[in-house]
């Protein structure tokens, strides 16, 4: 019965929305009997989507425009019969006019809308729907809980957030080479400008947080990053904590059966944003803009009956990353206590490894052990405790291999949409193995513990895999691959100055190192002070 009620409510809501949209149709769309997607009510220029894409005057852009009622009720029935034909004609007309860029009408439209991907003639409605289909299928359903068709999602974002609309198109362009070659840089510039504007607002929209979380998971394809994503995600976290938007993320708590699917979306957005920020703290070797209360808030998602296995995966990763972060920020690394904490974590979260979802939390668990034992080598060396170093070396090798094995267990489809945190784990594990190979070649480690030939073959397999899944030369996968390939060459030549467990002093060229920044694949250390 509850399901029936929800269906009725949803249907009623949809009908109400459609009536409102029909009443607000502009003169041009009403004349053509086609759907009219008006701009946001907060926008000074409310020109509809169709008029913007065709560079036409729109009556909704007129501040004196008022809502008119349809004089003839029979017009709806007539328009229903010919609507499909008119839609086809509109598409033909749109393509014919899309090449016109110097229309005098463009100068009459407000500067606020110049960042609109439609007005600039970058993408047609068909192309945007195509990109949104890609985005929803590969990214939106998993990371943003998108439960719309491409056309519905375009409608939603066009009225609520041009930033999220541009971000979705930007990420989806990875999978459309022809469109990517044509407009990627332009769309990226739009995203940069919109982010700068949103950061100045006192209460950013929920879609702003969604856009930032997606950019932290899939950083833009460019030679060097214009936006510091660690700083951007940190600003977003502070916005949530200090501004009136905090209420969005607190309203999902509770396990009442009346909660809807959308009630959990803000909680997921918050957790994904925290996850992206914390991964960058590990990868960039920077301080986190989070505290203990933040992680308590993240756990609240489990009180929602709509939480699923992927929510658990994200929460499990947040838990182990925060634990590892605190270990590396402590004055000294207590290995026994670190192992105890990691095993306690495994007891609590290993049930996730039996789920059909990708085992991201398992990858994070092995990565954490890899880091802990590598940092322990530093601690042992500083304390002249050389007796335990062979055991630590063996464990570094073991957990680096386990990390790589877990990554290779991902499905081909999941590999094709790997987020940056998976690429980082693959890169760091491979760099750890290269440091061990180097130590064996310089006679610092017994070759009975480290087998350079086997590890070399595996590292080669890793950087070749990274190149296979890479989108272009600016993709993070390519940058990690180039780093590992060059590092491997330096190690095997054996001409670099020995620095023991830290590997060669200069394993790669400054150009390769600069391209990878701000990621740091150097040896794991305890960050004192």
Curated annotation (Swiss-Prot):
Keywords, ordered alphabetically: DNA-binding, Metal-binding, Nucleus, Transcription, Transcription regulation, Zinc
Cell location: Nucleus
Pfam families: Zn_clus
Main location: nucleus
PROSITE patterns: ZN2_CY6_FUNGAL_1, ZN2_CY6_FUNGAL_2
Matches recorded under CDD domains: GAL4
GO biological process: positive regulation of pyrimidine-containing compound salvage; regulation of DNA-templated transcription; regulation of transcription by RNA polymerase II
InterPro entries per the UniProt record, alphabetical: prtT, Zn2-C6_fun-type_DNA-bd_sf, Zn2Cys6_DnaBD
DNA-binding region of this protein: 26-58
GO function terms (MF aspect): DNA-binding transcription activator activity, RNA polymerase II-specific; DNA-binding transcription factor activity, RNA polymerase II-specific; RNA polymerase II cis-regulatory region sequence-specific DNA binding; transcription cis-regulatory region binding; zinc ion binding
One GO CC term, this protein: chromatin
The protein, known as: Uncharacterized transcriptional regulatory protein C1399.05c
Source species of the chain: Schizosaccharomyces pombe (strain 972 / ATCC 24843) (Fission yeast)
